């Protein structure tokens, strides 16, 4: 079973990653040396825990955005995705295929002359598959 990480370890490693993301790597020993240089951590054991969690978070960041860590790269990527406008609309309304009943409903509403609506024969539903048991007699308990 894994160990529980304290709030101190989690908060401090998130802060270190936000400030020194460009220097952090996926290697524990490198991250430990970076922490030694950039932060004043009272004990070796706490430094190792923070370095370990920072390494863990760096691996998660490689896979995708991580909650609680705001990186400039991720913010720019999110902005780019939000501002994206597709060349062609995903909702094409050039032609709408409807069945006879729907056409009648549109006619009753006075919308039968709407452009792009065409009638299509409804597809037949498949016959239901035999019930459980494959046609055998019911179980006797």
From Swiss-Prot:
Gene Ontology biological-process entries: translation
- Protein family membership: Belongs to the eukaryotic ribosomal protein eS17 family.
Please give an example of a GO cellular component term from this record.
ribosome
State the SUPFAM superfamilies in the record: Rps17e-like
UniProt xrefs under InterPro entries: Ribosomal_eS17, Ribosomal_eS17_CS, Ribosomal_eS17_sf
State the organism of origin: Arabidopsis thaliana (Mouse-ear cress)
Q: Which gene encodes it?
A: RPS17D
Q: What name does this protein carry?
A: Small ribosomal subunit protein eS17w
Gene3D superfamilies linked = Ribosomal protein S17e-like
Cite the entry's keywords alphabetically.
Answer: Ribonucleoprotein, Ribosomal protein
Task: Name the Pfam families on file.
Answer: Ribosomal_S17e
Keyword hit for Ribonucleoprotein: yes
The answer, when asked if Ribosomal protein is one of the entry's keywords, is yes
List, in alphabetical order, the Gene Ontology terms for molecular function in this entry: mRNA binding; structural constituent of ribosome
């Amino acid at each position: 079973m894994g160990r529980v990480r304290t709030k101190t370890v989690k908060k401090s490693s998130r802060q270190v990653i936000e400030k020194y993301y460009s220097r952090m790597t996926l290697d524990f020993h490198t991250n430990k040396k970076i922490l030694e240089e950039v932060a004043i951590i009272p004990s070796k054991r706490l430094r190792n825990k923070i370095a370990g969690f920072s390494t863990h978070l760096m691996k998660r960041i490689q896979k995708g955005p991580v909650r609680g860590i705001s990186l400039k790269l991720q913010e720019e990527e999110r902005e780019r995705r939000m501002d994206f406008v597709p060349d062609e609309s995903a909702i094409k309304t050039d032609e709408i295929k409807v069945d006879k009943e729907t056409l009648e409903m549109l006619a009753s509403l006075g919308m039968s002359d709407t452009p792009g609506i065409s009638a299509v024969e409804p597809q037949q539903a498949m016959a239901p598959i035999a019930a459980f048991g494959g046609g055998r007699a019911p179980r006797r308990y």
